[in-house]
Design a protein with these regions (language model features):
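Membrane-interface helix-loop junctions in multi-pass transporters/channels
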Residues: 1-123
Length: 123
């Protein structure tokens, strides 16, 4: 059942996830320059944590709070798409291909690792 407490937990952890995403994006931009390593990092981490939570059979309320709140706001499909469009407008087509391939590869790898770790945790 969806309670006020559960909604508050999603809200709180969503804020924390958004702040974590912002911090990683700023750090990566300062450290690595224009290539969107920050987006790559937060989406990979979100895939890892989300798949772990599902495979570990976390109970519904914590899964909603951590998965829907923290992980949902940490990962950013909209920023990935915006970055691809920005690179396209600048004619950085090779970087688009690299970014998309890296995003898929790291996302799939992180998901597989998260599933394995979650299954081991649940066992």
């Amino acid at each position: 059942m969806l309670t006020i407490r559960a909604l508050a937990e999603v809200f709180l952890l969503g804020g924390i996830g958004a702040l974590a995403r912002f911090a990683v994006l700023v750090f990566a931009a300062q450290r690595f320059g224009a290539f969107p390593f920050g987006i790559l990092a937060v989406n990979t981490l979100a895939a890892l944590i989300g798949s772990f939570l599902v495979a570990a059979a976390i109970p519904a309320e914590p899964l909603l709070a951590v998965g829907g709140g923290f992980v949902g706001s940490l990962g950013t499909l909209s920023s990935l798409c915006s970055e691809i469009i920005a690179m396209h407008k600048l004619g950085k087509h090779e970087e688009i291909v690299l970014f998309v391939v890296l995003s898929l590869a790291t996302g799939i790898a992180a998901t597989l690792i998260g599933l394995e770790a979650g299954e081991a945790y649940h066992a």
